[in-house]
C-alpha cells in the first residue's frame, strides 16, 4: 500500500477548531513535524481539510 509523508508547514493557530483537531488526529503538533500514513480515503479527506497547512509527498512503502 502506498504511503504519504505529511509535514506541517504552517501553524494551526487562527484556524477553525475542526482544522486544529484534524492536525492533531494526523499526529501533527508543531511546525515541521512529519508523519507517515497509509494512503487511504479517510486520510486524504483529513488532508483536504488542512491542505493549506501541510505538505504531502508520496513515499515508497
Curated annotation (Swiss-Prot):
Q: Which cellular components does GO assign to this protein?
A: cytosolic large ribosomal subunit
On whether Ribosomal protein is a keyword of this UniProt record, the answer is yes
Q: Which InterPro entries match?
A: Ribo_uL30_ferredoxin-like_sf, Ribosomal_uL30_bac-type, Ribosomal_uL30_ferredoxin-like
Q: Name one GO biological process term.
A: translation
Q: Which GO terms describe its molecular function?
A: structural constituent of ribosome
**UniProt keywords, alphabetically:** Ribonucleoprotein, Ribosomal protein
Subunit details: Part of the 50S ribosomal subunit.
Instruction: Tell me its family.
Output: Belongs to the universal ribosomal protein uL30 family.
Q: What is this protein called?
A: Large ribosomal subunit protein uL30
Q: Which organism is it from?
A: Frankia casuarinae (strain DSM 45818 / CECT 9043 / HFP020203 / CcI3)
Q: What is the lineage of its organism?
A: Bacteria, Bacillati, Actinomycetota, Actinomycetes, Frankiales
